[in-house]
Amino acid sequence: MKAAKEARAARERILETATDLFANQGYRATGINEVIDKSGVAKATFYHHFPTKADLCLAYLKTRNSSELNSIKDFIAKKRTPWSRFLGVIESLEPWLKANQMRGCSFLNMVAEEPDPKSPLRKEGKKHYESLRNLIRKLAVELVESDPQHYGNLDADAITDEYMVIIGGSIALAEIYHDAWPMRQGIDMVARLVD
């Protein structure tokens, strides 16, 4: 029991260290030895949990996917109307970006560093955005169904596609400018999608 707890703790330390390093210096610039040194684990422990750097990165992305989507869902769960939940997805991103020092999206950053379109890392990035897309589509359908007289002429699939483009552009520009104004513009643009 104690050994299992220690193994989980070591794995978590490795992931926390990798999260910090990948976010601050990128995937390619982060070496395995640096992760091992900064996490304070033995090489054998590292390789027991993560046989390759790609395995570590994949675990990092899966953890990020879960935490980011849960954060968005928690944010929109506090909203009372279909309209506020729909808009809440992009509204949730400004505080998230500020908390991450405007480093942008882990998935976009990782995909930019991984040229192979068949890479598991790129596939995980796409999976993240597909999960986000499914959430937005669900909220778009909920919005249309909440007031068919007002929103009945809207195409939930088209709105979802436009919303995704706005999110991607807003996140990328917030990282480039190291400022939140692109997110605020993105919020206004999403609001206009359904007006």
Give the positions of each predicted feature.
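Amphipathic, non-transmembrane alpha-helical scaffold segments
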Residues: 15, 61, 65, 122-133, ...
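Hydrophobic/aromatic-rich alpha-helical bundle segments in the mid-to-C-terminal region
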Residues: 120-129, 145-191
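Basic, helix-initiating cap at the start of DNA-binding domains
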Residues: 1-25, 29-41, 55
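Amphipathic alpha-helical segments used for helix-helix packing
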Residues: 99-120
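Amphipathic alpha-helical packing segments from all-alpha helical-bundle domains
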Residues: 69, 74, 84, 99, ...
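Short hydrophobic/aromatic patch on the recognition helix
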Residues: 40-50
